[in-house]
Amino acid sequence: MARPRDAASLILLRGEGKTLEVLAGRRPLNVRFMPGVYVFPGGAVDPPDRLAWAIEAGTATLGPRLARSARAAMRETWEEAGVLLGRPAGPSSGLAARTPIEQAYLERGLVAAMDRLIYVGRAITPSHSPRRFNTRFFLGDGDHVFGTPAATEELEDVRWHPIGHERLESFRDVTRFMLARALALRGGTASGMAPLFYWAKNARRVGICREAETPV
């Protein structure tokens, strides 16, 4: 059984009612993991994600474990979809970028607004999968997104997909589950602790994340 690798994903929503949209893209057919499936931008947590960015703000609201996952989610969203979640920065104080994602924020005069992220929940890939991930999902407000979504080598058909009156049929169970949770958080109707979505004995299970999260 492969050990799941830490990963992170960002659910970006904008609009209301029938104009509600989510940022998503389709994984290429030639990849090993979830080919042809629509997903939110995201990917594995890399070692550099443990280090604070020069251009981040509000990180204390997350705690160390969620902070590095949040960095990974925002970095992957930039790499896969070409957009940044943040807010305009104040006067520059000679900050230096160590990584491409920091440079992207600096060039656009933005701050990575970690305090605008809401923790949605965690999902673990089934044990029979050849590639397994322990993924933490975050919710972000699409009104604070800078840039135009664009397809990359990692995601195709990247755009704001309408979900106000229909669901993307290509979404997997876990994606639909986390989207429903994100919508509940956005609408103020979510209850309980952040959920843990996993599989046991070939059945879908939903537990509670017992990390550093707090009740909503």
Q: What is the role of each PLM region?
A:
Residues 1-216:
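N-terminal leader/linker segments that precede catalytic domains of diphosphate-processing enzymes
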